[in-house]
């Protein structure tokens, strides 16, 4: 129904929502970052979703099935283009937001991790972890130590 089904627990809804928001599929490291769930919880929940026919796995990637989307009902869809950029700028934790803004402001140029460390004042490990989180959200691409804002963020 419109409110989603009672069959789904909170964890199932949360993970299924992430799958629905990224229809091209997400891997387990992305699911970890996007949900904050520990490995055992993720594993168990994905296993149950797949057993019920609500999620499918293709190689490393997980995606919702038609049944899964139907079961989920209404969920918050991610906007696209500039609206997605604004969406995340209002929702990212402070550390991620700071790094994200630096990467966005230098677009279309890429920024080196070293420059991001210097400009943000964060340690290398923090900068690296933050970039991994931004990449999981599909907000940045990372290539040879250079981070670039995702192209789609600048579409009208």
Listing of model-derived features with the role each one plays in the protein:
Residues 14-22, 58, 71, 98-106, ...:
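Short amphipathic alpha-helical elements of helix-turn-helix/winged-helix folds
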Residues 1-39, 43, 48-54:
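Long, compositionally biased intrinsically disordered regions
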Residues 23-35, 107-120:
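Short acidic, hydrophobic short linear motifs in intrinsically disordered regions
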Residues 36-52, 56-60, 121-137, 141-144:
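Short amphipathic alpha-helical interaction segments
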Residues 7-10, 21-24, 38-43, 91-94, ...:
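Short, low-complexity cationic-aromatic patches
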Residues 58-78, 143-156:
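Accessory beta->alpha helical hairpin/"wing" motif in late/C-terminal subdomains of nucleic-acid enzymes
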Residues 1-16, 73-101:
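Short alpha-helical segments that sit at the start of domains
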Residues 5, 34, 90-91, 122, ...:
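A composition-biased, non-transmembrane "mature-region" signal
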């Amino acid at each position: 129904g419109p409110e989603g089904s009672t069959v789904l627990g909170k964890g199932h809804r949360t993970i299924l929502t992430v799958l629905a928001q990224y229809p091209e599929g997400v891997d387990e490291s992305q699911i970890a970052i996007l949900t904050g769930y520990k490995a055992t919880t993720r594993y168990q929940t994905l296993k149950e979703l797949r057993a019920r026919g609500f999620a499918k796995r293709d190689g490393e990637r997980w995606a919702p099935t038609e049944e899964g989307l139907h079961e989920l009902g209404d969920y918050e869809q991610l906007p696209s283009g500039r609206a997605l950029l604004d969406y995340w700028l209002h929702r990212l934790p402070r550390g991620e937001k700071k790094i994200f803004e630096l990467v966005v402001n230098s677009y279309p140029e890429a920024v080196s991790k070293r420059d991001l460390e210097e400009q943000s004042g964060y340690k290398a490990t923090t900068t690296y972890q933050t970039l991994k989180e931004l990449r999981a959200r599909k907000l940045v691409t990372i290539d040879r130590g250079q981070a670039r804002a995702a192209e789609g963020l600048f579409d009208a």
